[in-house]
Amino acid sequence: MDTSRLTLDHFLSRFQLLRPQITHETLNQRQAAVLIPVVRRPQPGLLLTQRAIHLRKHAGQVAFPGGAVDSTDASLIAAALREAQEEVAIPPQAVEVIGVLPPVDSVTGFQVTPVVGIIPPNLPWRASEDEVSAVFEMPLAQALQLGRYHPLDVYRRGNSHRVWLSWYEHYFVWGMTANILRELALQIGVKP
């Protein structure tokens, strides 16, 4: 599938037609969720954040809004929506949730469920200075081009795992964020 002319309608029909399949068993027990905010435009965008540099974990990394499930969250989707509101001021009622991707294990011990949602283009996104240093929009068609991701095999604690690397403008996109974007591309039928 060629992503260069990807429209929102095409993305939605492909995502809803090809249901995600869980391909591996997750190992982590602690639950987290992220929102993959697709901006409603004829040529859709993807909202990403850069985490604040002072954070203990993943400082300065490009990420989706999200975080750990807490006791007030009714579901993984509720957790993703709450975190998106806290981090970038996206009101939960403004998100049209279209589905979830299979959970992925993080190196920090979380099982992370990506929640895909459509958001209006005119939201006044605002970064929470406590957690986010920047909010930016990337064209979804570019984010879903598999050729932009480069593999790096990392050996950690006697185990090997593959990390994906990419760039957008001056942002370095890698790790779980790049992996989730690749999985989303594969989910809608982009061929490697």
Curated annotation (Swiss-Prot):
A motif (Nudix box) lies at residues 67-89. The keyword Cytoplasm does not apply. Its EC number is 3.6.1.-. InterPro entries: CoAse, NUDIX_hydrolase-like_dom_sf, NUDIX_hydrolase_dom, NUDIX_hydrolase_NudL_CS, Nudix_NudL. Coiled coil: none annotated. Gene3D superfamilies: Nucleoside Triphosphate Pyrophosphohydrolase. This is Uncharacterized Nudix hydrolase NudL.
